[in-house]
UniProtKB/Swiss-Prot annotation:
Name under which the protein is recorded: Metalloprotease TIKI2
Segments on the Cytoplasmic side according to the record's topology features: 516-517
Matches recorded under InterPro entries: TIKI1/2-like, TraB/PrgY/GumN_fam
Activity regulation details: Inhibited by 1,10-phenanthroline, a metalloprotease inhibitor which is a divalent metal chelator. Also inhibited by EDTA. Not inhibited by Bestatin, an aminopeptidase inhibitor, nor to a mixture of inhibitors for serine, cysteine, and aspartic proteases and aminopeptidases.
Recorded family membership: Belongs to the TIKI family.
GO CC annotation terms, alphabetical: nucleoplasm; organelle membrane; plasma membrane
Membrane-side (Extracellular) residue stretches: 20-494
Cofactor binding, note field: Divalent metal cations. Mn(2+) or Co(2+).
Gene this protein is translated from: TRABD2B
Organism expressing this protein natively: Homo sapiens (Human)
Glycosylation sites: 228, 335
Annotated keywords: Cell membrane, Glycoprotein, Hydrolase, Membrane, Metal-binding, Metalloprotease, Protease, Signal, Transmembrane, Transmembrane helix, Wnt signaling pathway
Enzyme Commission number, as recorded: 3.4.-.-
CDD domains: Tiki (cd14789)
Region (Disordered): 354-409, 422-441, 450-492
């Protein structure tokens, strides 16, 4: 995912005793008067041909698609190379994400967590499973979803997961978030579209690079603190004594309406605990600050620098190609961003307002245009296949945003969708192309055939795959050295978690019905 996320867990851990008011109208925004009134998360790298940076958000694409300016969609269509944080259509990505969540050596959470904490967690998950049928919407049921399947898709095999992933899972098992299940998140949708359009796709990060900071680095007390605080918050919400401060609806509104200075972007949806209304004693505030500092460095600054360098490498490898980089919007906002890295290296990167024409020379090997979608650029105008976007408040993302703005890692919903959609593809046809984990000299690969299911309002919707693999990392040494059966690693950052059903859930009609078949 991060899902995704410069200060998510970070600022979240430090947020104490302060209930923040919720925006009144969720994801609703006023219709704009014209394209120029839309918010834009598109940046252009000035070169010949140009390259583009696009800020995504890890929420159902149908909630934001109509608010994405036509020139952003045109830039995507004009590109011949599309890169994401992770390769969302590669079976190895899915299997590695699934396995990195597992405790090593067949360990179980009951063996690792303190007795009381384990049973509190189990009681909460039992409650969620009981409530799941009432949380689901008629539309979800009409699309073939059922409660047990949905619960297993998110929380299956939870007792085998590392505490950090369980913490993220708990934060995705809320009524509001459950109601969003069934539609691919924007990142995944773009990956599916790129595959459908036969574009060359790839990634700038390896699965291990997203997993490692979560599975390693925190000591036993920090792990206990983060998981315990997460459960306390969810138990308070459940008891009615606390209202969730920021929800997916709020994040969608801020993305669509361009309120980028809002602190909500520090919390990339409710996947990350805020610990609001929790009075932390001084020693626990120190623990929170230590966790904040660690993840700020590992999940924000180091990732941005690494991603920026790999963007530059890909640009050098594809000097005559139009490249499109789709990362979490937070990677382009705040301090020490990917854009800062590129500018420091001498590249000219400009924000591209909505309504501004995209000037791109026609690609030498244009990708096939799916269902009448135009891929020819050269002043590229809004693509015919892209619906007229309803509106939103005009706001260009400022370059000097709050340093706590969070780059998105893949969130729990994002990853569970990857697995579910992948299980509906005959990915074994491509298995032979993934005999070895791809190294980073293979920064882009050709995506092959895919099946599609066209959703009503939008152009196309391809699919992706999944599989299983051995855990790439061992449990943090600090945790293994603990006397009591302590929890495995638990940070509270913004990485998403892949449901454990990688090896337990059978093929079923899609969890997310608008997704590919």
């Amino acid at each position: 995912m991060h899902a995704a996320l410069a200060g998510p867990l970070l600022a979240a851990l430090l947020a104490t005793a302060r209930a923040r008011p919720q925006p009144p109208d969720g994801g609703q925004c006023r219709p704009p008067g014209s394209q120029r009134d839309l918010n834009s998360f598109l940046w252009t790298i000035r070169r010949d041909p140009p390259a583009y940076l696009f800020g995504t958000i890890h929420v159902p694409y149908t909630r934001v698609w109509d608010f994405i300016p036509d020139n952003s969609k045109a830039a995507f269509q004009a590109s011949t190379r599309v890169y994401f944080e992770l390769d969302l259509t590669d079976p190895y990505t899915i299997s590695a994400l699934a396995s990195c969540q597992l405790l090593p050596h067949g360990e179980n959470l009951q063996d690792v967590l303190p007795h009381e904490l384990y049973w509190r967690l189990k009681r909460h998950l039992d409650y969620v499973k009981l409530m799941m049928p009432s949380w689901m919407t008629p539309a979800q049921r009409g699309k073939g979803l059922y409660a047990d399947y949905l619960f297993n898709a998110i929380a299956g095999n939870w007792e085998r997961k590392r505490p950090v992933w369980v913490m993220l899972m708990v934060n995705s098992l809320t009524e509001r978030d459950v109601r969003f299940r069934g539609v691919p998140v924007l990142d995944l949708y773009l990956a599916q579209q790129a595959e459908k359009m036969k574009k060359t796709t790839g990634a700038v990060e390896q699965v291990e690079e997203q997993c490692h900071p979560l599975n390693n680095g925190l000591n036993f007390s920090q792990v206990l603190f983060a998981l315990n605080q997460t459960l306390l918050q969810q138990e308070s919400v459940r008891a009615g004594s606390l209202q969730a401060s920021y929800t997916t609806e709020d994040l969608i509104k801020h993305y669509n309406c361009g309120d980028l200075s809002a602190v909500i972007f520090n919390h990339d949806t409710s996947q990350l605990p805020n610990f609001i209304n929790t009075t932390l004693p001084p020693h626990e505030q120190v623990t929170a600050q230590e966790i904040d500092s660690y993840f700020r460095q590992e999940l924000i600054y180091k990732r941005n620098e690494r991603m920026g360098k790999r963007v530059m490498a890909l640009l050098r490898e594809n000097e005559d190609k139009i490249c499109f980089f789709a990362f979490g919007a937070g990677h382009f906002l705040g301090n020490n961003t990917v854009i800062d890295i590129l500018r420091q290296a001498g590249l000219e990167v400009d924000h591209t307002p909505a309504g501004q024409a995209i000037h791109s020379p026609a690609p030498q090997s244009p990708a096939p245009s799916p269902e009448g979608t135009s891929t020819s650029p050269a002043p590229v105008t809004p693509a015919a296949a892209v619906p007229e976007a309803p509106s939103v408040t005009p706001t260009a993302p400022p370059e000097d945003e709050d340093p706590a703005l969070s780059p998105h890692l893949l969130l729990p919903d994002s990853l569970s969708q990857l697995e579910e959609f992948g299980r509906q593809r005959k990915w074994h046809k491509r298995q032979s192309t993934h005999q070895r984990p791809r190294q980073f000299n293979d920064l882009w690969v050709r995506i092959e055939d895919s099946t599609t299911a066209s959703p009503p309002p939008l152009p196309l919707q391809p699919t992706h795959s999944s599989g299983t693999a051995k855990p790439p990392f061992q449990l943090s040494d600090q945790l293994q050295q603990q006397d009591p059966p302590g929890p495995a690693s638990s940070s509270a950052p913004t990485l998403g978690l892949l449901p454990a059903i990688a090896t337990t859930i059978a093929v079923c009609f899609l969890l997310h019905s608008l997704g590919p078949s």
